[in-house]
Amino acid sequence: STALGVASTCVQHLALVARDHQTVGPVSLFVLSVLRSGERKSTIFRKMSEGIWEMQRELKEQWDHYQEEKQGKLTHLFERDIPPKILFEDATVQGLAKEIETGIRSVLMSSSEGGTVFGGIGMRGEALMGALAFLNKAWDAEAQSMTRKQAVSTYLEFYRLSCLISSQRETIQEWLSKNAGLAEGMGFLARFLICVPESTIGYRIYKQAPDATTKLDRFTEQCLKRLRQKRY
């Protein structure tokens, strides 16, 4: 599931998928993995997302170079006060929308600890309905505008958002119990591919690390190659 979420992020700015000539949509994915603590969620994501992190480092270097030189062809990415990002782990909906509008238009919202997402990003209280509405539209790459009191208006179009969340069952159950069925009623959970694998805690036998990770290296190489095809 982690590989699928990362892969969708790396190609979502390049293609659409068509079930028929009238039903065309993005290849972005919303993925939710329900796992116990200790299942190596963070380690797996770190390994699988190396291509995304490398692309962010490249963007940071380009941004740094632009800030030093302040010359050459101007682009909206490097005129910003902060480097552009692809990966977001802790952001409000308003902050995420503004980042997409002014920076990279193909991004990943991810967390190996579901509490970061379900406990943040405006997913509680009065902000919850607005957050779910935003994410529901983003799943289908639907154009949307956001206007909030004491906040700058944001308009999103031609963007892509994938979500890759790993969480403990207790975190999700607590969040669902507090939002009075709003997430289910608005179809938020229906947009996710939900994975609940069997626990391997207590059954994992130690194996010496391999000298080479050829398949993982090829995956990372392909991810980075696609991310460099800039069509944001």
Where are the regions a protein language model picked out?
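Phosphate-handling catalytic cores of nucleic-acid transaction enzymes
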Residues: S1-Y232
